[in-house]
Amino acid sequence: MPFGKPLVGTLLASLTLLGLATAHAKDDMKAAEQYQGAASAVDPAHVVRTNGAPDMSESEFNEAKQIYFQRCAGCHGVLRKGATGKPLTPDITQQRGQQYLEALITYGTPLGMPNWGSSGELSKEQITLMAKYIQHTPPQPPEWGMPEMRESWKVLVKPEDRPKKQLNDLDLPNLFSVTLRDAGQIALVDGDSKKIVKVIDTGYAVHISRMSASGRYLLVIGRDARIDMIDLWAKEPTKVAEIKIGIEARSVESSKFKGYEDRYTIAGAYWPPQFAIMDGETLEPKQIVSTRGMTVDTQTYHPEPRVAAIIASHEHPEFIVNVKETGKVLLVNYKDIDNLTVTSIGAAPFLHDGGWDSSHRYFMTAANNSNKVAVIDSKDRRLSALVDVGKTPHPGRGANFVHPKYGPVWSTSHLGDGSISLIGTDPKNHPQYAWKKVAELQGQGGGSLFIKTHPKSSHLYVDTTFNPDARISQSVAVFDLKNLDAKYQVLPIAEWADLGEGAKRVVQPEYNKRGDEVWFSVWNGKNDSSALVVVDDKTLKLKAVVKDPRLITPTGKFNVYNTQHDVY
């Protein structure tokens, strides 16, 4: 990464003092930063000025505040205490000074902070503003409690006015919910005809879609913490309720334990750091629980421990909640929400995403900045193991398959390197391999967000969405599960889409219900053409390209059946 000649010595020396410059693989770490640095929906309400910081007009402060929450908050945190990125509090930034900070923002760091200036993403004037801004005390966004939730809550169609049976002719189990990130929408796509059924307005940049246990209700949550509940039984799939559970969020889930199907919905917020339990038919808020508290490693207080992945237990009437910065997994029992019980399991800091092993008993969850996978036994309600894996694991839900030697394994790819880690998951029949990294495959490179296979498939797909090499980010690696010693095959997904100019990042393999097709998003800029590409899983040949002007920045895709039944 180039540095301006007059600043080379000063900048590198300062970076060393800050502990930011190491000899890590720059491209792979840049991929991780690019992912974590996604725009935040947080908008603090007032201007803060700090002794010792450069003067800023109100308009300058507000402009810089907006840039920070679009570009920086995902890594450095809302309160700038540090998360994936380093702390940027005034005691540190004022000591470094304006010139150093401008150089840092312009050229980035060898550890992976993006080069906002030399890449052209921020102007010189914007960089000057940002260097001033981070020398001020961070403005704290407002809290979001029950009054705010209830004010945002809307029941658009009352439960008693909803249909008693499915009124449309859609093959619901093979329907896909596709995130249209920058449009603030989802597209419902028929998996058989490959046509868009309906585009529905949602919150900003939907992060995930989840199905209720019955398969009737689709729940989507935007990064602005807005949840939309969509009734798939209606004559035309229709939004029936919505609520905002905070200011920024990533996760939503529905109760799945026998006897409690569809009864409750839970969602977790990045800000304020909390989760909320709601009525499963109306989204009426019932309970809010803060996640602020002590970290699992140093037992120090953290003011901003964000809620990441949430998964519904099949063993108990519980939600399993990842708390990112504290490194704790919470078992939230919803048997009696008026007397809510929460069990805290210490795991490792920076818990993020994960999914079930093939038995649906063990929750395999990545602590991405700790380079570990935590194994949570949902039946015995305890930590079974912490497994060391590669750099910055990001499994999505992960991928389960049967290895010829090690038996059932769960696998994850990584943002920070090109490895794929395989972890044994069968303590009964293969105890010598259980909860150990039994093998490691090598893919195209770092920058992976998702890995996927299917019980009926003999292939394993690995994307590399945030790899800085366009040839890699625009393609996927496919491993033959019957011959893992063979080199992976590369599928030129973006080339098959034939879109012309643009980044054309390929993201998230997703199977159809039958497990014989794999769908990919070709994610282009908001003003460019994007597409969905469908691959025949048996032949690895192109089967279809879905193009439509309404497919604006498609990213995540969620097949109704596979999401409902945790098939991955």
UniProtKB/Swiss-Prot annotation:
Enzyme class, broadest EC rank: oxidoreductase
Free-text remark on how the cofactor is bound:
Binds 1 heme c group covalently per subunit. Binds 1 heme d1 group per subunit.
Residues the entry annotates as binding heme d1:
H207, R250, S251, Y270, R397, Q508
The UniProt annotation puts the region (N-terminal tail) at 26-54
Ranges for the Cytochrome c domain? 55-140
Key word NAD present? no
Q: Which GO terms describe its molecular function?
A: electron transfer activity; heme binding; hydroxylamine reductase activity; metal ion binding; nitrite reductase (NO-forming) activity
Q: Which InterPro entries does the record cross-reference, listed alphabetically?
A: Cyt_c-like_dom, Cyt_c-like_dom_sf, Cyt_cd1_C_sf, Haem_d1_sf, Host-pathogen_enzymatic-act
Which stretches of sequence are listed as region D1-heme domain?
A: 141-568
The name of this protein is: Nitrite reductase
List the source organism.
Pseudomonas aeruginosa (strain ATCC 15692 / DSM 22644 / CIP 104116 / JCM 14847 / LMG 12228 / 1C / PRS 101 / PAO1)
